[in-house]
Amino acid sequence: MIRLVTLAALPVLVLCQFDPSKWFMGSNLGGLQGFGVLPARCLNYLEAGYSRGNRLPSHRFFFNSTSGNCEQFVYYGRGGNRNNFRDVFKCMKSCGCKQQRNGGVPCNPPSQPVVRYYYDTFTKLCNTFQHTGCGGNSNHFKDWNDCFFTCGNGFET
């Protein structure tokens, strides 16, 4: 189910999936996992802005809601929209970490699932899950430290 709601006068997209066989391998809330709330700014399309005067373009990051990843682009210095971050950490903290966990799809040839960590926005904890090795989104990390320092309070600026 996809529903657009307003929280504190800010529109957000709420993504809910209910499947007790696939979601929440740890703390189980009846199969409802981590809410996956993406702020509206994360859903904006890429807007590179425009150049004026002798201002040099710079490399920035935007959240690609199709791929579920923070991606680099060239920003021309003026204009654009709020889906524009100075570094990948701010992009991840604002958007990437707020996605539901995604175990990916089986690779071809198949490989054994591996334990990865994802950030749960509901519990504000990094939890383990099985990743199949192919696909998924940017809310998966090789170890707890990477997860915590990217998404938790370990990387506050």
From Swiss-Prot:
Subcellular localization: Secreted
PROSITE patterns for the chain: BPTI_KUNITZ_1 (PS00280), BPTI_KUNITZ_2 (PS50279)
Domain of life of the native organism: Eukaryota
Keywords of the record: Disulfide bond, Protease inhibitor, Repeat, Secreted, Serine protease inhibitor, Signal
Expression by tissue: Nacreous layer of shell (at protein level).
Pfam families (UniProt xref): Kunitz_BPTI
Location of the BPTI/Kunitz inhibitor domain: 42-95, 97-151
Signal peptide per UniProt: 1-16
Coiled coil ranges: none
Disulfide bonds: 42-95, 70-91, 97-151, 107-134, 126-147
InterPro entries from the UniProt entry: Kunitz_BPTI (IPR002223), Kunitz_BPTI_sf (IPR036880), Prtase_inh_Kunz-CS (IPR020901), TFPI/VKTCI-like (IPR050098)
CDD domains per UniProt: Kunitz-type (cd00109)
Keyword match Transmembrane helix: no
Molecular-function GO terms, alphabetical: serine-type endopeptidase inhibitor activity
Major localisation: secreted
PANTHER family per the UniProt record, alphabetical: KUNITZ-TYPE PROTEASE INHIBITOR-RELATED, SERINE PEPTIDASE INHIBITOR, KUNITZ TYPE, 2
Protein name: BPTI/Kunitz domain-containing protein 3
